[in-house]
């Protein structure tokens, strides 16, 4: 029987915040494969450079992706903290572009890579990760993510 787990994550970027639900299975002994469903709330701001002024409105993005997580140095580290690396890929869409069953919105490709560490707090696995998130809507940002997993 596969080892199935669930989790929630809060991701903070320079231009907004995301809330995610993660479910997955243990793929190999030190690897996990997860499905990620979440929303990203983009902040409203004005960006002024020497060439242009850009106004951005608040947007809500729907994120559907898959994530592969590998635990590193499992045999070598003594202690509570375990380093991990993650690779994530999938699709993201602006919720305002979804108008019904005939028009499912403007979906764009996204990817993310990151590194962090895991530790247990009682029976809940906590994870702190720093990611580089690239998609056409947020234009590539660093993200800090706190996730909690349980069985």
Give the role of each language-model region:
Residues 13, 119, 135:
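Acidic surface patches and DE-rich sequence motifs
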Residues 110-115:
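Short glycine-rich, acidic/polar surface loops and turns
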Residues 117-120, 139-151:
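Outer-membrane beta-barrel "beta-signal"
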Residues 77-86, 147-151:
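Flexible, glycine-rich linker and terminal segments associated
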Residues 16-18, 24-26, 34-71, 84-98, ...:
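Outer-membrane beta-barrel translocator/channel fold
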Residues 1-19, 23:
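Short glycine/proline- and aromatic-enriched beta-strand/turn motifs that initiate or cap beta-hairpins
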Residues 1-5, 27-35, 71-83, 120-125:
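Short loop/turn motifs that connect adjacent beta-strands in outer-membrane beta-barrel proteins
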